């Protein structure tokens, strides 16, 4: 730190000399960068783990089963809409992405619009969870959470809001238990996994080509799939941008503590990836990515068949136009497999996958779109 202060002081002293030899502009750029960097280092030195807070919206745990916790967010209007909304997030990341930062929280915005919002936290699987299956997650944990919400709200049905992989899970659940789902909202949810142009699908094995990973070998050898492995998979989809380029911009924001904290919150979420229960990972990768069974009507959850034609409830399909993880075509395919005369609505947003949660513009437009759509279907 002392060396950097010395460099700044020396550059200021040498400014007249550099001006004489025509390097004044270059010197000013170097000086500005160094001063910004110094200010940023001071901000970083004053931060600790507790400062990088996520999940700002007040909530209470209303049910727990094994490592799974069901939360209810504290309503902020006197009379919320009667049909509760359950957010079903993916297994591969932590659900606080929907409540990552103040001012851009999907949850907080939905609450302000009068919704009664619940959230499932799947927790962190341990070695003892290696044999958990999709049946355990969907017909077990998820179904039990739905029952608890119905009891608490005195409603026979609820609204599911499934996000990413959680959207795929919600489609499966609503197919198996249509009598418990009043409305279904899916957001950036993969449906047709046979999209070779999408790198995540190729790595998952949708073409079963040279890039396809050997799922059976992985699960048999490791049991649970490490979250660090999944982090690497996601980073390698855009290695230059995600592993290098974004960090070049950090000195520009280090002097602004609010921007720096938002960046660190995102970094915390990106690398906070739970391990995946081995058998669940095996079935999801093989049945969905490698064999595309969802749109073929061949997915089995236990001894029950998932049939998208069972989705007779109103459906809102939200997707990101610039999504590099879930291709728009993958999400849009849902409309081709629904029953005739289904109340089906599609809406897109001009952002990428993560932008659906953190873009300021999307958070101005997305929650009202969901709330308005639901208010017409109570």
Swiss-Prot record:
It catalyses: (3R)-3-hydroxybutanoyl-CoA + [(3R)-hydroxybutanoate](n) = [(3R)-hydroxybutanoate](n+1) + CoA. Forms a heterodimer with PhaE, which may multimerize in the presence of 3-hydroxybutyryl-CoA. Both subunits are required for PHB synthesis in E.coli and in PHA-negative A.eutrophus. Nitrogen-free medium induces chlorosis in Synechocystis, leading to the degradation of the photosynthetic apparatus and concomitant accumulation of cytoplasmic polyhydroxyalkanoic acid (PHA) granules which in this cyanobacterium are composed of PHB. Its EC number is 2.3.1.-. Pfam families: Abhydrolase_1 (PF00561). Signal peptide: none annotated. GO terms for cellular component: cytoplasm. GO terms for molecular function: acyltransferase activity. When expressed in E.coli with Synechocystis PhaE and C.necator PhaA and PhaB, confers the ability to synthesize up to 13% (w/w) poly(3-hydroxybutyrate) (PHB) depending on the carbon source; all 4 genes are necessary for PHB production. Cell-free in vitro coexpression with PhaE gives a heterodimer able to polymerize 3-hydroxybutyrate-CoA. Poly(3-hydroxyalkanoic acids) (PHA), of which PHB is among the most common compounds, are prokaryotic intracellular storage compounds with potential uses as renewable, biodegradable thermoplastics. Cyanobacterial PHB synthesis is particularly attractive as cyanobacteria use CO(2) as the carbon source. This is Poly(3-hydroxyalkanoate) polymerase subunit PhaC. Belongs to the PHA/PHB synthase family. Type III PhaC subfamily. It comes from Synechocystis sp. (strain ATCC 27184 / PCC 6803 / Kazusa). One of its GO terms (biological process) is poly-hydroxybutyrate biosynthetic process. Residues 84-356 form the AB hydrolase-1 domain. Pathway: Biopolymer metabolism; poly-(R)-3-hydroxybutanoate biosynthesis.
């Amino acid at each position: 730190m002392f060396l950097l202060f010395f460099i700044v002081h020396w550059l200021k002293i040498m400014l007249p000399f550099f001006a004489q030899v025509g390097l004044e502009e270059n010197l000013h750029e170097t000086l500005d960068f160094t001063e910004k960097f110094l200010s940023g280092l001071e901000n970083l030195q004053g931060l600790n783990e507790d400062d990088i807070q996520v999940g700002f919206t007040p909530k209470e745990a209303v049910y727990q089963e094994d490592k799974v916790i069901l939360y209810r967010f504290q309503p902020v209007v006197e009379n919320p809409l009667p049909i509760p909304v359950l957010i079903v997030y993916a297994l591969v990341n932590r659900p606080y992405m929907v409540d990552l930062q103040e001012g851009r929280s999907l949850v907080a915005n939905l609450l302000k619009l009068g919704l009664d919002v619940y959230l499932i936290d799947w927790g962190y699987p341990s070695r003892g969870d290696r044999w958990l299956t999709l049946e355990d997650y969907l017909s077990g944990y998820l179904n039990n959470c739905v029952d608890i919400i119905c009891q608490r709200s005195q409603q026979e049905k609820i609204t599911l809001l499934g996000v990413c992989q959680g959207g795929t899970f919600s489609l499966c659940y609503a197919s198996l238990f249509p009598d418990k789902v009043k409305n279904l909202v899916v957001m950036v949810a993969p449906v047709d996994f046979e999209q070779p142009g999408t790198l995540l699908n190729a790595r998952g094995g949708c073409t079963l080509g040279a890039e396809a990973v050997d799922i059976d070998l992985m699960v048999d050898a490791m049991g649970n799939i490490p979250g660090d492995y999944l982090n690497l998979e996601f980073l390698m989809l855009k290695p230059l941008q995600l592993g290098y380029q974004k960090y070049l911009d950090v000195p520009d924001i280090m002097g602004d503590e609010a921007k720096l904290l938002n960046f660190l919150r995102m970094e915390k979420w990106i690398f906070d990836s739970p391990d995946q229960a081995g058998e669940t990972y095996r079935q999801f990768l093989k049945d969905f990515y490698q064999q595309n069974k969802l749109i073929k009507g061949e997915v089995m959850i236990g001894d029950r068949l998932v049939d998208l034609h069972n989705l007779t409830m109103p459906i809102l399909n939200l997707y990101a136009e610039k999504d590099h993880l879930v291709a728009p075509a993958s999400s849009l395919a849902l409309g081709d497999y629904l029953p005739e005369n289904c109340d089906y609505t599609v809406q897109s947003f001009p952002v990428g996958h993560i932008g659906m949660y953190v873009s300021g513009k999307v958070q101005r437009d997305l929650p009202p779109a969901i709330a308005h759509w639901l208010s017409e279907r109570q």
